[in-house]
Amino acid sequence: MAARLYCQLDPSRDVLCLRPVGAESRGRPLSGPLGTLSSPSPSAVPADHGAHLSLRGLPVCAFSSAGPCALRFTSARCMETTVNAHQILPKVLHKRTLGLPAMSTTDLEAYFKDCVFKDWEELGEEIRLKVFVLGGCRHKLVCAPAPCNFFTSA
């Protein structure tokens, strides 16, 4: 069973942040309140970042107060359909990097929740893992191959 998390975009960094859903929130729908983001800092990963908890190979920044800055997608089928085949996300991120009108932060957040994150959480597939980084991530991923930075906008 995959860890229950919710995601939120930090528009100041163009970074998708994941937050573990607390035990008291278990079972609530992902469309509920998302809370607020902490202000990012260069040393966002504390010494005790919780990597020992082993939540499906999340990046070590997953437990920082600023939230993780990389997401290890485990739904290769969904990513092939929505991203690789139609090239939706790379085009959107490229436009945002250039400062051109593109998908709004709210729409992009909904895209991850509805098209990607739901399958990742429910299916828990760990075959043909891919890493998609929005805004760049300086943290190593736990038990993951070298990240595919083709979405990096930094």
Curated annotation (Swiss-Prot):
GO biological process terms, semicolon-separated:
DNA-templated transcription; symbiont-mediated activation of host NF-kappaB cascade; symbiont-mediated arrest of host cell cycle during G2/M transition; viral genome replication
User: What happens on changing residue 12 to A?
Assistant: In expression vector pCMVX
Record key words, sorted: Activation of host NF-kappa-B by virus, Activator, Apoptosis, Host cytoplasm, Host G2/M cell cycle arrest by virus, Host mitochondrion, Host nucleus, Host-virus interaction, Modulation of host cell cycle by virus, Transcription, Transcription regulation
| Organism of provenance | Hepatitis B virus genotype A2 subtype adw2 (strain Rutter 1979)
Task: Please report a single Pfam family linked to this protein.
Answer: X
Spell out the residue ranges making up region: Mitochondrial targeting sequence. 68-117
Post-translationally, this protein is described as follows, namely: A fraction may be phosphorylated in insect cells and HepG2 cells, a human hepatoblastoma cell line. Phosphorylated in vitro by host protein kinase C or mitogen-activated protein kinase. N-acetylated in insect cells.
The record's function comment reads: Multifunctional protein that plays a role in silencing host antiviral defenses and promoting viral transcription. Does not seem to be essential for HBV infection. May be directly involved in development of cirrhosis and liver cancer (hepatocellular carcinoma). Most of cytosolic activities involve modulation of cytosolic calcium. The effect on apoptosis is controversial depending on the cell types in which the studies have been conducted. May induce apoptosis by localizing in mitochondria and causing loss of mitochondrial membrane potential.
Q: What is this protein called?
A: Protein X
Q: Does the keyword Disulfide bond apply?
A: no
Main location (coarse class) = host cell
Q: Which gene encodes it?
A: X
GO-annotated cellular components: host cell mitochondrion; host cell nucleus
